[in-house]
Every structure is written in C-alpha cells, then in structure tokens.
Amino acid sequence: ELSYFSTYIPIKATDFDKVELYRLKEQAQKVINEHILSTHIAVMFFSDLLKYKVEFSDDDFETLKAFLKIEFKRMLRKVGYKNFQDIDFKSVDELLVALLDVCEEMHYEASDYCDRIGFQNEGISPYMGSLCSYLHFLHPLLTKFSQLHSIPSYLYILIDDADNLNTTQKQVLNSWVYYRLGTNISLKISTQMRYNVYLTLSGQTIDSPHDYSEVNISNVYTSSKNKYKELIHDIVQRRLVEFKLPNTNPNDFFPEYKKQEEAINKIYKYYIKQFEEGKSRGSKKFDDANRYSRPDYIKELKSSSKQGSSYFYSGFNQLIHLSSGIVRYFLESSTYMYSEMLKNSTKKEIEFISPTVQNKVSRAYSNEFLFEEFEKHKKTAKLRGYSSDNIRYLRNLIDALGGLFSAILLSNASERRVFSVAISNEPDELITEVFELGVGLGYFQISTIGNKEGTGRTRLYVMNRRLAPVFTLDPTSFAGYKFLRNEELKLAILDPQNFIRSMKKKLSLNVEEDLYVNDQLELFEE
C-alpha cells in the first residue's frame, strides 16, 4: 500500500499558454495564469479520486460535508464564486462530483474569457469571474483532504513537462515552490534542461537546495549499472503480462540477432584466450573481452561494407542502452516495433519482436532524432528563443563528434567505446552556449569528471546514445572519454568534416592522446 496519493498533471496535454493573455497588463496576466493552474490541478485531483474509486469512511464523509458547508463556502466567497448551493449529499461520490463541477466551472470562466478577448479589436472587457490562488484556495483545499483518514496523508502533485509553461506560468509555479508549504502537500516537478526561469512573481529567486531539491534523472539512471535496467525490465514485463501476450520475458520478447551474437562471442573467447596466454592489455581476465569484442565485430563489418549497416541493433539489453536512460525512448521505439510486427504478421498474437524489425526501427528512430526533429528545432528556433546559428552549430557538433567517436571505435585505442567529451581548457561563450543548447534539446547529457591536470573537476558532455545507429557506434558502454581543446571544438562547430580529418590524423599519430577511461561511467556492464 502506497504512503501517498498522487495526481499527475501533464502540461503538454493542456492549453494553458493562452496567447490572448499577452494583451492584458502584466499583473492581470499573473493573477489569471495562477487561477488557471490552480483550478486545473483541483479538477485533476477530484477526477483522480473518482477515477480510482477511493473509499471514504463514514467519519470522513461527515467531515467533508461539514467542510463544504462552512470552510469551502468561505473559500469560494473569497475567490469570487457565488453559485455554490447547499446540497444534502447522499454519497461521497456525489460530493466529489460537486467539488469537481465547481472547480471546472471556475477554470472555464477564465479560459473562456481568454478566448473571447481574442476577438476584441479595441478595448478589452474586464474579467469578472472568480480568481483562485495556491495560497488561498488550492493548498488549503488539498490540505483538508490530506487530513482525512481514508487516503494517505501525503499528497503529491506530479507536474510533468513544466518547461512547456510560458514565462509567467513558470513564475507562478516558482512562487509555489518558494512558499515551501510541503509538509503534507508536495510538488514534484519534472522538466527538460531548458527550464530557464527561476524568478517568482515577486521577483525573488528560488535556489537549490534551499527552496527545492533537484535530481537529474538521466544522471541517476546512467550512473547505475543495474537500476535503470531493472526499471525497464519491470515496466516491460508488467505490460506484456497486462496485455496477455504469450511471451512475458522481456529478454525473449526482444531477442538478439543470433548470428551476430555468435560472431561477437567468438571474438570474446579469443580475448579470453589471449589473457590466458599472457598477451592481453587488460589486467583482468574479462577486460579485453568486454572492451574489444563488439568494437572488433563492427570494425570487421566496416571493412567489408562501406556503410557498416549490417550491424544489428537488437536484443533487450542493447535497446536499453539505446534509450540513453530515458524511459520514454524505450517505450516509444518499442511501440513502433510492435506496430511494424503487426503490420507484417498473419498471426493474431505477436510472440516476439524480430531482430530485423528491432534493427530497422532503432535506425529509423535514431535518424528521426537527428534529422526530422532537428528540422523542427530549426523552424521553431526564433519562437523558442534559440539562435538559429547555434542550432546549426549544434548539428555540426553532433556530426563532428559522431565522426570522431566512430574513428576511435575503429582504431586500435585501448578504450574504443567513447561517447563523451570534456574540454581541457576554458571554453568560450559560444562553445558553452552550443553545448547548453544540446543539453536542453536532449542531444547531450551532462556530468562532471576530474580535469586533465588532476586539480579539480570539469564538465563532461555525453552524447545521447539514441544517436548510436546514425554513426554505427557501440551503445553498450561509454567507459572512455576524449579531452578536446576549445579551439578544436570551434573547428567542429564551423567545419565538422575538417575536424574529423584533423582528429583522424591525430589518432594515426598517437591513438591514446587525450583519451581516458573512467570506470564510474560504465553503464550496465556485464
């Protein structure tokens, strides 16, 4: 039994960003935006109580009836709502529906007002509806429910994709965080890295850890060898069971390409034998086998095929790595795979996703990330406040680093599985901006490592492994990282092909130069 009750608020599934509100004065925008957010969350909360059929005790029912007759009516008078009528409720559900209806009516008062003023060319009629706030409406309302015995005392408001809120709405949300009223009511806010507003409505800043605790989910998952893998395994297994599919083992449902794995295993055994004969680079029996068997296989494919496209991205474990610590990536690509199998199958039930389909969809999903989604970023750059030049530089940077990582994979370096770069000297403003844009758009993840001199720490930028198929890289680990100078990265964003040629030349002279291994960065190593 859970110790909390949560309500999920997906911002992407709302129409909060009312452009008509920009016609109002700044203070009016703030007040109406807070009202829209507050009433929407209240509506979702009561909808969830009804949806999940929460059973309330008789004592709680009496408590709620008394609350509606006195406290709730007083709250409604304060926010300007005058249509509430006393009703002799026969059941808790009837009472919850009444609460839901009131909150929904107040929400649409403001929403409809925004739509109407969009048609007013001259002068704007004043808003005459109710105005709810977090402090005087939403928080006391939720607090009352947290005091009941029939539901857990901790209520979590899960606000997803908060980066999609407009600037004023982010300030509203920041103000709620700033109040720090989280004894029983806790705000859990998820956002992409592009959430860039940390001011409240009154101009105060919110700071971590003073006002909130911040967790980078990608860092949590990608820094653990088992946590993310176990999470995906549990999610997939539950879904396979729920849909009553004949095969509920994720490893069997997403099988490896047998011919490929047999060839890699043959190379793996070769390196084990080399160790036993005292001819290995690594100090442990499985070091070389883990490091080189898959890169060597890809290298062999590259030598026999110009594109190297016969490498298969298949198998449950490899698909987990391709998702780069982001659950949505795994589930979305899996959905495409299942649809592809249904389209080409004569059977009523899908027993497994064939390696061919896994590989086909994985490559298409990777291409979509780099090509189609990048085109969207180009078209919306101005609207979202991005520099169009920086969008172009970011694309060049990805191409340049993808080419560099591919060259390292095909080299004789001691560590060929490289997905990360660190900057060995001080990056200039442009390089910093381009990397930050890449992090914000999900093409890079950010971490830290010890600097080259061993005197402190520096930022490490990890390329999203969803891009691995574009460059035919091994996604199953990223133990190595490459130090690059600011001047080299400047060449990468301006002329990626010249950068790749320059890096290949350096690799041919000294393959180990500025190439390092960090065991803490290994992901799901077997």
List PLM regions with ranges:
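Short, well-structured alpha-helical interface segments that form or flank functional binding sites
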Residues: 32, 36, 40, 133, ...
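Alpha-helical repeat scaffolds in large eukaryotic proteins
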Residues: 46, 139, 143, 178, ...
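A short acidic (Asp/Glu
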Residues: 18-22, 166-172, 197-202, 332-335, ...
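C-terminal leucine-rich, beta-strand-based interaction scaffolds used for sensing/assembly
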Residues: 11-12, 213, 270-526
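Glycine- and acidic
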Residues: 27, 123, 155-160, 218, ...
